[in-house]
Amino acid sequence: METHLYYDTLYQYQGGVYPAHICLPTDAYLPMRVDCIESLYFRCVFFKNGMHYTEWSKLKFTVISREIKFKDVLKNADFDELFTGLVVMTIPIPIVDFHFDIDSVILKLVYPQLVHREIVLRLYDLICIRPSSDRPSEVSAKNIGIDFYQLTSQGNKQTPDEEKRCLFFQQGPLEPPSTVRGLKAAGNAKPMQFPAHVNEKMTESFLSDSWFEQKVRCKKILDFTQTYRVVVCWYELSFSREMQIENNLLSASQLKRVNAADFWDRTDRYLRDIGSRVLTHIVKTLQIHNRQFKQKFNCNFPVNFSFEHLLSFMQLGKDFWILNLTLDSCIIKAIICFLGFRNGRKSFLAQDEVWGDLIDCSKGSVIYGEKIQWILDSTNNLYSTRREKQNKSWELYVDCCALYVSEKLELDFVLPGGFAITGKFALTDGDIDFFNWRFGLS
């Protein structure tokens, strides 16, 4: 893997980091194919009198969007599984006082339309792949010192062949002593004879050559939630083999103060909080308008359509929406856009687009975080909606509701018949703190 070779060499001279060489295979649990990944980020979680999160750092990566076996690239790899696609990367883990009981690495995958997936990996699984019984031989240890771009393994010292050829180009006078340039007539001087150059067998060893001939140990690991597969690679010639890494055990009292699932627990608490606030905002907005609905979207409804019918759909839609609320929700994406736009980032949506959660009350299912286009009909001043892979506007389905949020945090909860409860969602300092921690936004 050229990507692993490049970053192993880079981090060797950078110092202070452990290179975790990993591959992320195409997985059924990933939302899209690996070649759809727009960017990768990582952060580490260390124990420092509590849970300490490093800042998000962007990762370079290589995508292999074809069938591949490790042995096709690394012939001495101990892994022969066939993958339909891979994302190859190296995570530079800072060398600190490690606590394998609690330390972890979080890998963030960013897809189109602000779809994020986080993969939490135990630090122990990433670092402890190296066999404890393996030790570098003298030959292998010598190869580790070879520079990636070095032409020979002898530094600036010339090879015997180079010394032989340089004898004919030694510095000296242009003419013999006592010769005045231009006064001596040209004679029939015998031309200088150069010995024929004989190609000698190359005996030099290059790291870029030996990298693909070395022993490679590969191991499949699962993330913290036992959902995603990751392949960790250990290379015999990696500079990390010489590192002495110690595990600092936590005492019983220290373990009581930390939570290995802190990353997920904080996220779940926030989702429950913001979901409750959105629903409270909808109810209060309805009360402010004396429980009156205004039709905003273009669709027909039965003559016997009652107010109680709308209220029952409103309650049902709210319950289904909050039941499986995720970070893909329109409210989360709208806040990301709002904070990003405030910090000078470009808009993710066109002027006539919003983020939408589409609620199907007949099935009890929700499609979260869709990009929705609003189309205004000038004849009746009502909107129709459009989204990819859907020919029929969502408001035309009689048993469906929708929640729409714009990049300005303008919120619409749409009921059957195109009736909408419209308001504007307000952020708190807690929202800003959460998005700065979770997404690197503020």
From Swiss-Prot:
Keyword Hydrolase part of the UniProt annotation = no
Could you tell me the keywords of this UniProt record? Capsid protein, Host nucleus, Late protein, Viral genome packaging, Viral release from host cell, Virion
Q: Name one GO cellular component term.
A: viral capsid
Superkingdom to which the source organism belongs: Viruses
Write out the GO biological process terms.
chromosome organization
Subunit-structure text: Interacts (via C-terminus) with capsid vertex component 2/CVC2.
Role according to the record: Capsid vertex-specific component that plays a role during viral DNA encapsidation, assuring correct genome cleavage and presumably stabilizing capsids that contain full-length viral genomes.
Q: What family is it from?
A: Belongs to the herpesviridae CVC1 protein family.
Annotated protein name in UniProt: Capsid vertex component 1
Question: What organism is this sequence from?
Answer: Human herpesvirus 6B (strain Z29) (HHV-6 variant B)
Q: Which gene encodes it?
A: CVC1
